[in-house]
């Protein structure tokens, strides 16, 4: 029965099945899993009354998101058939007043809140033994009984860097948004690079949805100025030789062939990396990939990788990203999607499915004979609507991810299935130990055009060139001098955004840039 903002389920009869245990300790060490993840669904009977508070925004800018999660919470409560269960909803958009109201309702567990700041406030005000299942992905906002159901950014980054190791990537760079989240993700990439021995050799940041900023970041990352200058100088040398030197027919043919080859490209020079990891949204990634190709770095030059930020993005048919891989959650349960659409009139996003699982976990805890900590922190985890997951004593979550690959023809294929249990550890890094990363310039000896053209030995000594290189920090063995070093200048303040949230991204019509003229 629905009364205002409260669901009340009263027992009509039935035997006592189990009573919720005590809080337990949130700091306990989590042992290795010994069994498969448990299913969370069933019918719960108990003669004791149980109370659950739900803290979600129902008004304000995030009201639509909160209402979407609420629909899944209500679904889970109704489907559970739990007896003597009282569920109260509180509008977290009201701030600390709503949090105090939720705490004063004397709940056994709180589902929510959505944002990190609210989670911190709840953590500060709640009793130490009260468990909270939030939806923030900020590791600094959880702990001390506040847990999260969200996908932690480190899970996604570590999964894809591990795939890079499997692909035998030698060195990689990251392209990330110049936001708090972007710098944190870059830090996660650095930690994963160290853990899996895949060197991270460059990090470049851009303003989201800003074409000029994206262009500048990719131009810098591709060493475009140096590689273009080296290309120009190589053509000059070959043209001078063809015009001014007395050549044999074989020598002349060789020079002409090299000039013809150079005419088909705008740059020369090897890159100090063979992979690119995109840490932004799918739409920004498409722009970045187009500029990379424009500046002479395509899929043949560097393998491309992404994170769960691509999940749901309109990116599958992008030819510039053909072959790119990314980490993603498994498809949401079709059964849940069908039921949710029938109830809410719209497809569920990932947060809605997280809310459904959070509610089932909460109900299971209240009706369990285990302590709260023992139930919630079960090392075997649970089977949810988006695959298996488990909660950690630190408050973080772990979710099994699969590896997807873009085929370039609108299709996405699974190249590595998600794990189905936690018998072996899935992750080695924790977000709370990650430090945000700043820009990392490429360490390169630059580009000497003489290394990319072949001259007759008898005249080679007459022609020389300086080495061109952007952000050149490694020592060069060449005897040529006048090395040009070009450093980026950027006095913009970082752009701070809301919490990272693994929600489905709305498709945006792409504008191709193939015809843009780039001024050097």
Features from the language model and the residues they span:
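Extracytosolic ligand-binding ectodomains
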Residues: 2, 6-12, 19-520
């Amino acid at each position: 029965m629905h009364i205002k903002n409260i669901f009340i389920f009263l027992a009509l009869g039935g035997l006592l099945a189990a009573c919720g245990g005590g809080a337990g300790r949130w700091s306990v060490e989590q042992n290795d899993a010994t069994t498969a993840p448990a299913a969370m669904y069933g019918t719960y009977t108990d003669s004791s009354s149980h109370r659950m508070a739900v803290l979600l925004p129902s008004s304000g800018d995030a009201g639509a998101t909160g209402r979407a999660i609420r629909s899944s919470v209500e679904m889970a409560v109704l489907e559970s058939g739990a007896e003597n269960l009282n569920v109260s909803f509180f509008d977290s958009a009201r701030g600390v007043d709503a949090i105090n109201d939720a705490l004063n309702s004397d709940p056994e567990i709180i589902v929510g809140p959505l944002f990190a700041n609210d989670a911190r406030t709840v953590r500060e005000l709640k009793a130490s033994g009260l468990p909270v299942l939030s939806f923030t992905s900020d590791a600094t906002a959880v702990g001390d009984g506040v847990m999260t159901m969200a996908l932690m950014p480190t899970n996604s980054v570590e999964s894809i860097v591990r795939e890079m190791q499997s692909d035998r990537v030698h060195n990689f760079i990251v392209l990330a948004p110049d936001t708090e989240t972007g710098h944190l993700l870059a830090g996660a990439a650095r930690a994963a690079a160290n853990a899996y021995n895949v060197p991270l050799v460059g990090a470049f940041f851009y303003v989201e949805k800003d074409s000029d900023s994206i262009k500048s970041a990719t131009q810098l990352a591709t060493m475009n100025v140096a590689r273009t200058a080296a290309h120009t100088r190589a053509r000059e040398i070959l043209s001078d030789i063809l015009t001014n030197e007395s050549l044999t027919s074989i020598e002349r043919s060789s020079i002409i062939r090299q000039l013809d080859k150079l005419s088909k490209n705008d740059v020369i020079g090897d890159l100090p990396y063979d992979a690119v990891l995109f840490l932004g949204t799918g739409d920004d990634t498409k722009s970045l990939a187009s500029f990379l190709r424009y500046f002479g770095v395509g899929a043949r030059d560097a393998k491309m990788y992404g994170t769960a930020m691509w999940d749901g993005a309109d990116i599958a048919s992008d030819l510039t990203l053909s072959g790119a891989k990314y980490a993603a959650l498994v498809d949401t349960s079709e059964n849940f999607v069908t039921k949710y659409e029938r109830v809410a009139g719209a497809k569920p996003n990932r947060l809605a499915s997280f809310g459904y699982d959070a509610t089932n976990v909460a109900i299971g805890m209240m009706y369990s004979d285990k302590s709260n900590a023992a139930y919630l922190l079960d090392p075997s985890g649970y089977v949810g609507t988006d695959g298996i997951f488990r909660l950690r004593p630190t408050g973080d979550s772990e979710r099994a991810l699969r590896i997807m690959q873009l085929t370039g023809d609108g299709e996405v294929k699974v190249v590595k299935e998600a794990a189905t249990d936690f018998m072996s550890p899935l992750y080695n890094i924790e977000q709370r130990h990650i430090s945000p990363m700043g820009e990392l310039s490429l360490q390169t000896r630059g580009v000497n055009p003489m290394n990319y053209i072949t001259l007759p030995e008898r005249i080679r000594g007459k022609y020389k060139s300086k080495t061109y290189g952007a952000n050149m920090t490694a020592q060069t063995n060449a005897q040529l001098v006048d090395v040009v070093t070009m450093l980026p200048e950027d006095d913009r303040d970082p752009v701070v955004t809301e919490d990272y949230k693994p929600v489905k991204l709305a498709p945006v019509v792409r504008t191709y840039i193939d015809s843009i003229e780039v001024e050097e």
